[in-house]
């Protein structure tokens, strides 16, 4: 039998959105900051030769240039102030989380609650600045070597570094503001908007190739069907759960004895969400971004890296799949579903898994179940991310589209819709509480005894 909360969620009407003032304010706040982000992608970095840059990006559109342009919302192709995008922040998050699982001092900070979380976030910001400085300097030098700068020199490099680092830090601040005062995860929404903004241009280019005969009609229809099938598959897998039965014993409160209750612990097939795909993509882009922009000026090492780890190459696909599997397990067991904490919480609440002792045995059982579930989850992520890469390379499609982009778009949309529904449900609860309080006051007023009139003398 469904609970009251589940019944309210099922009967939730989107018409209540007009009455939820706070939710509407959060939505408008989020849209406003995302518009600011999109405007910033069109503000160019000073000193760049726009014509040469456009020619270069057109040539690189089907490879690494298309990937970088997709993840930066086209800012890199226009060399805007947000050309580095949010990737330095994501890379810094990877490094800090890896160190937190290996360095005892950082591991202790994770256990200190809100104070420790703020300290770790501060370290992540410092790492973001350091990585952004490194990437911006390398990009400035690469732009000079690629003959994309009007006046090469120290002043050009300094202006590029200051502009790009400032743009990345501003994006990080935008993401934090959206998370705190808007709807959804700010960092994910920024990446989502950047991807969606590039879709119309790529779609128009794809259809134009079909009209010109460069791509056959069956290929166009096949790609459309494949994208629709992948989207449906992603939605299905993101909602898939492995339920573990939880039993709570009978308890006595005062003179009353309450029967034992049963519930379930939901374990998603993909507990890590879109994070492994973003982590893997950011690490793959890090070593090849600089070498791509340096053109023919690259050394033998960078040329070899670009040749073997370019999009569609066997080593690129193998490395991509391996990183997705690694980050799926790492992020799940260290961040999104820590079996030690879950087992401890169950023990403190008096819950237990039938046939399993609370404590260490429960933790071992949860680790066993999650490890097996993640075999399916990591394989699903690798399949979704690699399938479009292989098909695009085999069919020679002249622009980039990837499973990572589809995964990010679908996951962010589902997460944002869930958050909107949660706010609407909370607003509906508040309305019910206010009505019950008003009825209580009216009931007290109606049942009050009338005052007696003074007796006549």
Feature annotation, model-predicted:
Residues 1-110, 115-457:
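N-terminal cationic and glycine-rich segments that engage phosphates or anionic surfaces
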């Amino acid at each position: 039998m469904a609970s009251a909360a589940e019944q309210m969620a099922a009967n939730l009407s989107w018409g209540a959105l007009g009455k939820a003032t706070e939710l509407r304010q959060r939505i408008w706040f989020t849209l406003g900051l995302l518009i600011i982000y999109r405007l910033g992608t069109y503000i160019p970095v000073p000193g760049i030769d726009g014509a040469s840059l456009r020619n270069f990006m057109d040539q690189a559109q089907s490879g690494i240039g298309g990937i970088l342009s997709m993840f930066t919302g086209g800012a890199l192709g226009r060399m805007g102030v947000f050309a580095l995008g949010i990737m330095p922040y994501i890379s810094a998050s990877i490094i800090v989380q890896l160190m937190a699982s290996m360095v005892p001092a950082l591991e202790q900070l994770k256990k200190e609650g809100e104070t420790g979380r703020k300290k770790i976030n501060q370290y992540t910001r410092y790492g973001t600045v350091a990585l952004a400085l490194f990437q911006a300097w390398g990009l400035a030098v690469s732009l000079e070597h690629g003959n994309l700068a009007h006046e090469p020199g120290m002043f050009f490099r300094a202006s590029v570094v200051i502009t790009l680092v400032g743009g990345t830090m501003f994006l990080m601040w935008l993401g934090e503001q959206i998370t705190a005062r808007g709807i959804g995860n700010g960092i994910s929404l920024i990446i989502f908007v950047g991807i969606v903004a590039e879709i119309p241009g790529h779609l128009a280019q794809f259809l134009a190739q079909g009209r010109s005969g460069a791509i056959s009609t069956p290929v166009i229809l096949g790609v459309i069907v494949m994208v629709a099938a992948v989207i449906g598959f992603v939605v299905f897998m993101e909602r898939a759960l492995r339920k573990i039965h939880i039993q709570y014993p009978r308890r006595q409160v005062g003179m009353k004895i309450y029967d034992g209750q049963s519930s379930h612990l939901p374990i998603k097939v993909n507990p890590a969400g879109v994070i492994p795909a973003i982590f893997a993509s950011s690490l793959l882009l890090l070593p090849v971004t600089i070498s791509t922009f340096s053109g023919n000026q690259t050394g033998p090492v960078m040329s070899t890296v670009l040749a073997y780890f370019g999009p569609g190459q066997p080593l690129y696909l193998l490395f991509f799949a391996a990183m997705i599997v690694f980050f799926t397990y790492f992020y799940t067991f260290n961040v999104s579903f820590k079996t030690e904490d879950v087992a401890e919480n169950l023990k403190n609440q008096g819950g237990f898994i039938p046939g399993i002792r609370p404590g260490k045995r429960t933790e071992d059982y949860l680790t066993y179940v999650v490890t097996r579930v993640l075999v399916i989850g990591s394989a699903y992520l690798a399949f979704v991310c690699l399938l479009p890469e292989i098909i695009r390379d085999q069919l020679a499609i002249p622009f980039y589209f990837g499973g990572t982009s589809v995964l990010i778009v679908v996951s962010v949309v589902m997460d944002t819709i869930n958050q909107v529904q949660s706010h609407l449900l909370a607003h509906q609860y508040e309305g019910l509480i206010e009505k019950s309080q008003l009825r209580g006051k009216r009931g007290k007023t109606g049942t009050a005894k009338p005052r007696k009139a003074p007796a006549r003398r």
